[in-house]
């Protein structure tokens, strides 16, 4: 019997070379504000300051410079042109989280793990379809570390 993998959810990851040399600089350029927007859950973000206003954050150019080798690889993976529309940062205190959401129905989104200690889990993704045998929701937590970036279909709930 042959197995056919009819649908695949491609997630790409890359480790930023020499991340430890750049981490503090990136963090120093961030200006996060505490929010309890919609959920009452507290976390820190610059989403409403930059993304919602259509402004690029102070750290964007530096991050783009560091990610240039990653974008060169993406050019080889994707057979279509792409643009980077926006960038924002978020920080979660112990026990903090963000409500389940996606980033729209088209394209890819990314998470750069600027700071990730061993006590925090990376982003948890939820399958766009349920387990076929039991009907359960399936989840995936990528094996990433500080300085890694992952690219995922924007439609994926996380």
What is the meaning of each model-derived region?
Residues 1-80, 97:
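Non-heme Fe(II)/2-oxoglutarate
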């Amino acid at each position: 019997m042959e197995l056919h993998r009819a649908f695949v959810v491609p997630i790409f990851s890359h480790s930023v070379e020499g991340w430890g040399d750049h981490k503090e600089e990136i963090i120093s350029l961030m200006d996060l504000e505490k929010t309890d927007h919609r959920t009452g859950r507290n976390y820190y973000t610059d989403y409403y300051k930059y993304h919602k206003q259509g402004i690029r954050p102070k750290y964007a150019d530096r991050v783009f410079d560091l990610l240039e080798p990653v974008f060169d690889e993406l050019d080889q993976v994707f057979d279509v042109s792409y643009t980077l529309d926006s960038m924002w940062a978020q920080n979660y205190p112990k026990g903090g989280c963000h409500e389940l959401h996606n980033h729209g129905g088209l394209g890819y989104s990314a998470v750069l793990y600027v700071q990730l200690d061993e006590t925090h889990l990376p982003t948890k993704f939820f399958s766009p379809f349920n387990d076929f045998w039991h009907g359960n929701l399936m989840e995936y937590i990528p094996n990433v570390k500080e300085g890694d970036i992952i690219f995922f279909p924007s439609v994926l709930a996380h």
